[in-house]
Amino acid sequence: AIANDIETSPYELIYFLMHEAGKTIYNAMDEIREAIDFLRYYSEEIIKIHNRDSILDGPTGEINTLSYSEKGHFLCISPWNFPVAILIGQISAALACGNRVTVKPSEHTSILGYLVIKKFHKHGVPVSALELILGDGTYGDAL
């Protein structure tokens, strides 16, 4: 749903990629496409592994079970030079695996960080599962 939303209406993100991150329109469009690819990739991957344990034969005859579970709380700090694609990749990977996420975008692209988080909340990700912290690098250091 988020990928489709961004794909059908990328204009606000493109505008701020150009004006806040300094990208050309072509670079902004490329970053939007990459962000959409991340969303679709992680949604497809989680469907493959969700609730599926794999039985693995061990080298000495034992049987091992590989299972996936959430790890807890993730911190995603995004760079200024790919503020949408990398951030969406980080968030979608962590959320797809059932983790809570705190996001701290670069202070140079904080509007884009806010807009990305807003997209996830709009499509049903609870605020308690995806939080946003804005500030300079000292906030990232403290986190």
Question: Can you say where each PLM-predicted feature lies in the sequence?
Answer:
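Rossmann-like NAD(P) dinucleotide-binding subdomain of oxidoreductase/dehydrogenase enzymes
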Residues: 18, 22, 46-143
